[in-house]
From Swiss-Prot:
One of its GO terms (cellular component) is cytosolic small ribosomal subunit. It comes from Thermococcus kodakarensis (strain ATCC BAA-918 / JCM 12380 / KOD1) (Pyrococcus kodakaraensis (strain KOD1)). It comes from the Archaea. Keywords: Ribonucleoprotein, Ribosomal protein, RNA-binding, rRNA-binding. Signal peptide: none annotated. The keyword Repeat does not apply. GO terms for biological process: translation. The keyword Transferase does not apply. One of the primary rRNA binding proteins, it binds directly to 16S rRNA central domain where it helps coordinate assembly of the platform of the 30S subunit. One of its GO terms (molecular function) is rRNA binding. The gene is rps8. Part of the 30S ribosomal subunit. This is Small ribosomal subunit protein uS8. Belongs to the universal ribosomal protein uS8 family. NCBIfam families: PRK04034.1 (NF003115). The lineage of its organism: Archaea, Methanobacteriati, Methanobacteriota, Thermococci, Thermococcales.
């Protein structure tokens, strides 16, 4: 059986493990996009360290959880967003103003909606975390 959306599977796995109180979680299969999303979550203090373990196949990410995630999910479909429209999407996916992050794939890489707004660039919404 194949995964239809590995990013959504990884984020729901992280959310479920946080709710049960686990300290670490293993995410497979690994991909560049999942790695970039984990990097953004690490920079914003939602997870601890993470590392890529080579299993001879697609790889596995081992993620340390610190108990700061209430909910994380993938945004489907991947909506295109202009720089001036982030507030509308923030109201739609986040529970309160300045609480949580939207993760955006831009031409300059994967970043939060706040960083993209500072740079004045748009992109595609791929996930939210709060």
């Amino acid at each position: 059986m194949t995964l239809l959306d590995p990013l959504a599977n990884a984020l729901s796995h992280i959310t479920n493990s946080e709710r049960v109180g686990k300290k670490e979680v293993y995410i497979k299969p690994a991909s560049k996009l999942i790695g970039e999303v984990l990097r953004v979550m690490l920079e914003n203090g939602y997870i601890g360290e993470f590392e890529l373990i080579d299993d001879g196949r697609a790889g596995i990410y081992r993620v340390q959880l610190i108990g700061k995630i209430n909910k994380a999910g993938a945004i489907k479909p991947r909506f295109p967003v202009k720089a001036r429209d982030y507030e509308k999407w923030e109201k739609r996916f986040l529970p309160a103003f300045e609480f949580g992050i939207l993760i955006v794939s831009t031409s300059q890489g994967v970043m939060t909606h706040k960083e993209a707004l500072e740079k004045g660039i748009g992109g595609r919404l791929i996930a939210y975390v709060y």
